Amino acid sequence: MSYLGVGVSPGNVPVYHGTNLKVMERRMRVVELVLRFVICGLGLVAAILVGTDTQIKEIFSIQKKAKFTNMKALVFLVIANGIAAGYSLLQGLRCVVSMVRGNELFSKPLAWLIFSGDQVMAYVTVAALAAAAQSSVFAKFGQPELQWMKTCNMYEKFCNQAGEGIASTLFVCLSTVLVSCISAFNLFRLYGDNKGKSSARW
């Protein structure tokens, strides 16, 4: 293996590892950009679906209105999706500017900041999804032992729309986890580069 980043195959054909690395980095940047805008779009969709979810039901001549604020888990879900959408929009714009200028990340402080932000978003969205999913199970099936009735039997439209919002949040969660993995790679790659440069000096 040459120190110039050029390897020689068994057939004596030069292989440019540096070029392959740049291609991989470019693809990862495109994937990161797509994922961030997916989070932004689906997070906004989930927040709107749940935030506008209402249904009025008349029970014994008394009108009762179901809305997302009646369940704290759904309030958390709306807030988490809104924050994730806004954060991902800002990070997506940063990715676009970086790709247009052709420059890469990075200083280590900025890499740490992005990594930390992505980790927080992943944990927050996963927690919101878990809380909303548990509440939806109680609403759908009830809890006979605690005498909790099945509310979805009365508010079917409300539950269906909330379910659509939770489904969108599932894709948001998966995307935030993937983005956090990419940002972790981008961060620790900087330390790997420095280690390689130090070894080259010796």
Outline where the language-model segments fall.
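A surface-exposed beta-alpha-beta supersecondary segment
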Residues: S2-S9, Y16, E58-K72, F76, ...
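Signature of small four-pass
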Residues: R29-A46, V50-D53, M71-S136, T176-N186
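Cytosol/matrix-facing amphipathic helices and coiled-coil assembly/linker segments
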Residues: N20, L44, T54-I62
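Helix-boundary and loop/linker segments of multi-pass membrane transporters
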Residues: L21-V23, A66-N70, E104, M154, ...
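A hydrophobic membrane-anchoring alpha-helix module
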Residues: N160-W202
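Cytosolic juxtamembrane regulatory segments of membrane proteins
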Residues: K65-N70, P109-W112, Y191-W202
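Plant-biased recognition of short, low-complexity, intrinsically disordered N-terminal tails
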Residues: M1-R29, G192-W202
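Juxtamembrane loop segments immediately following a transmembrane helix
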Residues: F60-K64, A131-G165, K197-W202
